[in-house]
Regions:
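N-terminal "arm"/small-domain region of PLP-dependent enzymes with the aminotransferase-like
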Residues: 2-62, 70-71
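Conserved PLP-enzyme active-site core in the AAT-like
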Residues: 2-4, 12-14, 18-21, 81-195
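Conserved N-terminal alpha-helix of the aminotransferase class I/II PLP-enzyme fold
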Residues: 40-92, 114-121
């Protein structure tokens, strides 16, 4: 054996997975369950109280999802990943960690229509404000930054226009503003794509 780290292809197939100890099956099964068994009431209380790690309810996580998350983290060179049911759910999860009522974020004008609707209408109920910027005019992002700006949101490839966003230039605006840059990478094909 060598001490060589697994490559991208190996990680894509095996990261996060362990052979089943009972059957020896190599592939992670799809766990089609919503709920899990607890050892007793104290065990359940410790799980729901986030004092112990384990499966509680599939909406929160399950063994199949855990393997997906570990695999994505390994492929991206990250510490962890979080799988959610949709892109809109991902937007909510990320922005809920960054924004409070009255805060704002900057978004590129060239976005998927569903995102534009969510940002313009649904997020108002959270008290979040969106400032729109033109991805073809990097200065518009700089001009949109205010003391209430908590994040910048773009798509790597605008949907449906297909225009390529200058991620590096907008990342520099975000760095100068001291806010995270959130990049929706839905339309990119693979890790070797040139964006």
């Amino acid at each position: 054996m060598t001490d060589r780290l697994p490559g991208f292809s190996t990680l894509a197939v095996h990261a996060g997975a362990q052979p089943d100890p009972t059957t020896g099956a190599r592939v992670t099964p799809i766990y089609q369950t919503t709920s899990f068994v607890f050892n007793d009431a104290d065990h359940a209380a410790s799980l729901f109280g986030l004092q112990a790690f384990g499966n509680i309810y599939t909406r929160i996580g399950n063994p199949t999802t855990a393997v997906l998350e570990e695999r994505i983290a390994a492929l991206e060179g990250g510490t962890a990943a979080l799988a959610v049911a949709s892109g809109h759910a991902a937007q909510v999860v990320v922005l809920q960690q960054l924004l409070m009522p009255g805060d704002e974020f900057i978004a590129a004008r060239k976005l998927y229509g569903g995102s534009i609707n969510q940002f313009t209408h649904a997020f108002k109920s959270f008290g979040w404000n969106v400032a729109w910027a033109d991805p073809d005019d990097i200065g518009s992002f700089e001009r949109a930054v205010t003391p209430r700006t908590k994040a910048i949101f773009i798509e790597s490839i605008a949907n449906p226009a297909g225009s390529i966003t200058d991620i590096e230039a907008i990342a520099e605006v975000a760095r100068k503003a001291g806010v995270p840059l959130i990049v929706d990478n839905t339309l990119a094909t693979d890790r070797k794509s040139v964006v």
